[in-house]
Amino acid sequence: ERKITLEDLWKDYVFSPKSITGFKSMNDGEHYSTIEKTDNHQQIIKYKFINGQKVRTIFNSKDFDIPKINEYEFSQNEKKILFKTEREKIYRYSSKSIYYIYNVFTDKIKKLSDKKVMHATFSHDAEKIAYVQNNNLYIKDLRSQVTKQITNDGEKNKIINGASDWVYEEEFGLVRAFEWSPDGKHIAYYKFNETHVKEFSMDIFRGGLYPSQEVFKYPKAGEENSIVKVYVYNIEEDKHQYIYTEKDYEYYPRIKWTNNADLLVLYGMNRHQNELDFIIANVAANTNSILFTEKDKYYIDIHDNLTFLPENNFIWTSEKNGWNHIYIKDLEGNEIQVTDGKWEVTKLHGINSDEMNIYYTSTEDGSTNRSLFIQNLETDEKKKLNNKIGYNTTSFSKGLKFYMNSYSDANSAPIYTLHKNDGTLLKILEDNSDFRLKMKEFNLSEKELFTIKTEHTEMNAWMIKPPDFDKNKEYPLFMFLYGGPGSQQVKNSFGWTNFYWYQMLAQKGYIIACVDNRGTGGKGAEYKKMTYKELGKYETIDQIEAAKYFGNLNYIDKNR
């Protein structure tokens, strides 16, 4: 049996199962597209949901002289595709790239700009693209090929238009800081004034003999943040409208247009992040009002589970009863709670209005698992759509008629399948059987999931023992942890390359373990948020308790 080497892991990528890349539902809800690599070329291929059969190749890079495609995005009418290439990372999520626009009907391709830009996004009619360059917002008209700069005050470490500052990207997950209105006549955008934010410098190694120094605005706890304002730009009138709010908020973590092109939603938040106002701004009337306020004794997690429905209702998720659940609200402030229980909704997929069915993923099978459910809004009847306990990650078609599911568990690589919306299996797209067969060459140990009880709490944990484990021997212990707010390291899901690094250590005679301390996710708001204002205290207590637990096991050398 083969032993795992570092070269296997990080040089030859032996432990990389197949996946479905670039999966996107197409507008008709009957087809989907993926991006696939063959003979060093990339193709975007259209398939049928009903049977997974190929319909046609939409794009083949061998016909064009363009770099490797990092991402692709259809325009709303699917007549054009935007390609992101030569991606250059900035912070955790942000990047700048060379973009190309491909016309599906003329089979022609054009570069958006000769320079790298950020956040290129089609207008809803696909006739314009907005993007950010050098902290300013631009619009390119694809008919006339004229590019217009719509902000002029952008300057590094001073003013940012249309892209987020470090805090919003890292702490709120907001990267693109502008939104096209549904009718394409307006762009709502953020303006960050970080002039008074203190600077941080960091050495960056780019392959040369000496590093270069990156100086950027980085507010530490208690220091001054960027001053943030939201504007709406009227394209026809070439005017910028400041969205005034009654309160002076520290943060605006999200903006989103409703289905009505005059109504823009803003989240307004205080510095402690424990009070959120849901604000509706009427751009045409230049008025706004607070629809509802949410408060929390700890803090409020920002999410993207806001979905507007045709009836002027919207779906919202909240942890206000201690667990993340689904609510339907209307613009008068009325609400109906849809889900309830001591478990969390981890993803909202949407509502099929015709059948009154809502689809969501939750922890109802335990905090380390993810399962897909359908619930009828009229009868409250609920059904689980996956039949295996483990980690299910689901992507639905437009209109929610079909879905693709990825299933894995702690010891199994993902299986990708197509289904009807009632759970009926249509096709296995990839079962990674070749990968599973190859793994039999290696002497692998099982990753065991269990819980550890202490006098303070109960924690999820996993352990990997050496392949030739002998309970009468003592083994050194390697504990891996992260344990940051809302994170989860202990999941009943495939661990990708890190899983095999742990297996390599196990083959060398180590026991590897991981414990999710208080402050981590999947177990309700109280468990996750109790570290508020005391970050590091309970996490340390719990990891020490876990280490003591392991040290008392007969087969672990407590000195190692």
Question: PLM features: residue spans?
Answer:
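Serine-hydrolase catalytic core recognition
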Residues: 199, 261, 267, 393-560
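Beta-propeller domains
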Residues: 34-62
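A short helix->beta-strand "capping" segment at the edge of beta-propeller domains
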Residues: 2-18, 237-244
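Conserved beta-propeller blade repeats
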Residues: 15-35, 63-81, 99, 114-132, ...
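Predominantly five- to eight-bladed beta-propeller fold
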Residues: 6, 52-55, 86-91, 95-98, ...
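Structural motif
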Residues: 40-46, 91-98, 134-138, 197-202, ...
